[in-house]
Amino acid sequence: MPLALVLTAVVLGSGLLAGCGGGETSGSATQTTQPKLRVALVLPGSADDKGFNQAAYEALPILEERFGAETAYSENTPVNEFEQAFRDYAEQGFNVVIGQGFEFGEVAMKVAPDYPDTFFLVTNNPDVQGPNLQGLQPASWEAAYLAGVAAGTVSRSGKVGGIAGQEFPVIVAQMEAFKLGVLAVKPGAEVRLTYLGTFEDVEKAKETARAMIDDGVDVLYHIADAAGLGVIQAAQEAGIWAIGWGKDQNGVAPDTVFTSQIVDQTAMIVDGVAAIAEGTFEGKPRTFGLDSDVLGLAPIRALPGELASKVETAVADAKAKILSGETEVPFIPEPTG
């Protein structure tokens, strides 16, 4: 299967009029044309969740501008409709179909062999691969470690909380790395990690966050997509600090979200589709680390000047040690308790 979306068309012509004299030309001409790049995105949540799903959605206008792509998307897609959504887009002739999230991996591996002329990308999944299938995996646990360093530096009570959606391996790995980051700067701290079982239930997230706050937690971190808004709301109402996830969420609560763990789904998806459009696609997983534009922390905001500087220094030092190899952030796929 061709890896570049390039079509060579041979146009045969005869009896073509040339100029006013009515002269005739016969022969053949070869043209290289670029077919329309058509990209479909399947989202498990809302395209305006101010986080994980929205960041993926924001890749579409960039692809339209950069490649002249035609794009389409489905949002709030139930798990039991993942496969049909993939098949529908492939049947409609989309060149690229993207599943936003680890949970699309199994479906992609099932569907991809049936549509060899369609490329399938699954984000946040290091396991999927095939001739026309690729997982795009940010080493998000490294950025989560930095978020933990920031949280541990800010916390006065020594109690920090992390609230996540589903207990997927890549989510667990980030939660565990966050915990390690907190303990690196505040040994003996209490780090409470909780999984909601949902990425959508804002009220459940808010109630969970309130319970942590009532127990003395003074910094909250989330990996909960739309439900994470409930975590931020609870922190804002209680007057404690919060760390966003996915994109810079300071705008959600400017006096509460002092930084965010950046996992730039937009940049990662654009990069993945660009490889297909430009013919450099390889059917094996790609990992994006702290040395890429995909991962990091958002600028430190809202904190008092001296504390802000302290956090920036601690985070910069931790990042340098990761990049140099002095600190290795492990991938821990199961909760350690």
Language model features: what each stretch is:
Residues 15-19:
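C-terminal motif of bacterial Sec signal peptides marking the signal peptidase cleavage site
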Residues 1-6:
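Bacterial N-terminal signal peptides that target proteins for export
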Residues 27-337:
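A residue-level marker of the well-folded mature domains of exported/periplasmic proteins
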Residues 21-24:
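Bacterial signal peptide processing site
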